[in-house]
C-alpha cells in the first residue's frame, strides 16, 4: 500500500442551516471550519461523502 492514493479537500461553505446529515458528513471528512484542509485516502466511500457535500467542499489536490 505504498502507492495509496490520497485526496486533499478544503471546506468552502458553512454547515449552518444545512441538514444534519450534511453536517455529520463534514465531521466525517474531518472538516469543521471554513478554510480547513484535510488529506484522506481516495476510496469510494470518501468520494461518496464528497459528492454528498460537493457544494460545501472543493478538491485541492489528488495524488
Curated annotation (Swiss-Prot):
<protein>
    <recommendedName>
        <fullName>Large ribosomal subunit protein uL30</fullName>
    </recommendedName>
</protein>
<dbReference type="InterPro" id="IPR005996">
    <property type="entry name" value="Ribosomal_uL30_bac-type"/>
</dbReference>
<dbReference type="InterPro" id="IPR036919">
    <property type="entry name" value="Ribo_uL30_ferredoxin-like_sf"/>
</dbReference>
<dbReference type="InterPro" id="IPR016082">
    <property type="entry name" value="Ribosomal_uL30_ferredoxin-like"/>
</dbReference>
<dbReference type="GO" id="GO:0003735">
    <property type="term" value="F:structural constituent of ribosome"/>
</dbReference>
<dbReference type="GO" id="GO:0022625">
    <property type="term" value="C:cytosolic large ribosomal subunit"/>
</dbReference>
<comment type="subunit">
    <text>Part of the 50S ribosomal subunit.</text>
</comment>
<keyword id="KW-0689">Ribosomal protein</keyword>
<comment type="similarity">
    <text>Belongs to the universal ribosomal protein uL30 family.</text>
</comment>
<dbReference type="GO" id="GO:0006412">
    <property type="term" value="P:translation"/>
</dbReference>
<dbReference type="Pfam" id="PF00327">
    <property type="entry name" value="Ribosomal_L30"/>
</dbReference>
<keyword id="KW-0687">Ribonucleoprotein</keyword>
Amino acid at each position: 500500500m505504498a502507492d495509496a492514493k490520497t485526496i486533499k479537500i478544503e471546506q468552502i461553505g458553512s454547515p449552518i442551516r444545512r441538514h444534519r446529515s450534511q453536517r455529520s458528513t463534514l465531521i466525517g471528512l474531518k472538516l469543521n471550519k471554513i478554510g480547513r484542509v484535510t488529506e484522506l485516502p481516495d476510496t469510494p466511500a470518501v468520494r461518496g461523502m464528497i459528492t454528498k457535500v460537493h457544494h460545501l467542499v472543493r478538491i485541492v489536490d489528488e495524488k
